[in-house]
């Protein structure tokens, strides 16, 4: 309460405690008794942008078009006029983004880790072009953003702010010059690895090679700090996480990861790393991938991948994904739920702190999703579930977007401070034997 006796108000003009109290004693999901929370969440998201850290729609459109001789990447799915509640080829379209309250989206310009050298660079450029083309196709609903101020302005105009993130250091082909060019083209973060090691950093899902970052990898992080590109530590090994935290002068991000103490999967973040986010200022954005949020689903994933390897296949083999699909048909995996995601978010909050968490669903980057979060319309349900557990409006605003917007601003401040430093000219062979 304020000194005048009125309830303490948030910046959006609603009582901070409204969301935390409205849902207590709710009837089960699907009944009208739960709509008070949903309505309050939707009201909040109209005034405050929800920023999702990772969506793979650009690659999904590319993959769909490769299998359809009559369509292009921009025509293969009806992104602009998708119908809510019907089965579509993607988890994401513009009507569902609107229904999900997304105010800003980091579109992944992912390319597969089996691409290397110039092939990886050129495909990354095609992905950047695909995002730009999507935005140009729907100027009344999308606009490219680069800064936190851009996000707030675009959201206030009723459109979705569109940012880009590269997923894997293979996209720069060991070239600091290519890194700088990606930043010039609007890429705001780079995940240091994807599922495989790069020459200068270890991945969470590959055999240990370096033990973390090499000397050149440390220079990559330093150059990212200098140019204002966020260092994304999703997908990297625990050693790489720790080395990057030690090297980075700007806050780091995990754009789509969970808590390893909740689900023991190498893609998730150990508690000692989460504990260091407060001093670094960074953010861990909770993912929704079933095998990262549910232990039974994680164990099933290990089992089917072991079975594929026993059959003589590797992730780069043409038969890898068909084998996994057949295995899942014959041995259905456990079903993850929104409650699993809530458990991760609450653990991230407990260890890293309320100022160091966010959301990164990984929609269109995984074939299945938890019950209740099947597509991008699920965010209001998730936030309402947290409100039902006592989260205040301030808490939800931080999770939804305030924390990652603060990190963007901090990265830009660091880049301003470092702007007088010359760009690094090192070649990898000069630093790494």
Question: Where on the chain are the PLM-derived regions?
Answer:
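Alpha-helix boundary/capping motif
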Residues: 2-3, 10
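Short hydrophobic/aromatic-enriched beta-strand-loop microsegments
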Residues: 251-257
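Short, surface-exposed basic-aromatic patches at helix termini and helix-loop junctions that form
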Residues: 244-249
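Active-site glycine-rich loop that binds ribose-phosphate moieties when present
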Residues: 211-219
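Substrate-binding cleft of carbohydrate-active enzyme catalytic domains
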Residues: 220-233, 239-240, 271-279, 347
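Compositionally biased, intrinsically disordered low-complexity segments enriched in Pro/Arg/Gln/His
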Residues: 6-7, 14
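Glycoside hydrolase catalytic-domain context in secreted enzymes
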Residues: 227, 234-239, 287, 396, ...
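N-terminal hydrophobic targeting/anchoring segments and the immediately downstream early-domain regions
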Residues: 19, 24, 28-210, 260, ...
